[in-house]
Amino acid sequence: MTDYPNNIPAKLEIIKASEITPKEVRWLWYPYIPFGKVTLLQGDPGDGKSKLMLSLAALLSKGAPLPFADEDESGEPMTVIYQTTEDDADDTVVPRFNAAGGDGDRLIFIKEDEKSLTFGDDRIREAVEKYHAKLLILDPMSSYIG
């Protein structure tokens, strides 16, 4: 039996599929990135994962249509939170974002000067809610686990 914190036994609870009301998935970028779910972008070092995500962030920041979308699928400009442990904002991230034509007021970073950020950090939720961010990029995600 799995224990919860403080060694309280976990109680078995089940739900039948017949008791679940199915709902539609909402998409940030159909069929690649759903809203409210973790999406991983995998590739070898140097494949351009960070550059791709910054290009998407730039398009979202302007409300421009994403690749493979219809031209009429542009929407409202969105705020994106970008966190990275591999590149500096001033010499890599912001120049790439600017080169992709992004709106610098809509790309934000959570400062980690005093405390490193982790995946479950309340500052992420606070930033998403306060700035109405629609996309959180953790590059690489493995640096934020723990």
Where are these predicted regions, by residue range?
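A short, basic N-terminal segment
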Residues: 1-19
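Hydrophobic positions on the alpha1 helix immediately C-terminal to the Walker A/P-loop
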Residues: 52, 56
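Post-Walker A helix-loop "phosphate-sensing" segment adjacent to the P-loop in P-loop NTPases
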Residues: 59-77
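Residues at the beta-strand->loop junction immediately N-terminal to the Walker
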Residues: 42
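Walker A (P-loop) ATP-phosphate-binding motif of ABC ATPase nucleotide-binding domains
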Residues: 38
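Conserved inter-motif catalytic segment of the P-loop NTP-binding fold
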Residues: 4-9, 24, 28-30, 45-47, ...
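Residues immediately N-terminal to the Walker A/P-loop in ABC ATPase nucleotide-binding domains
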Residues: 34
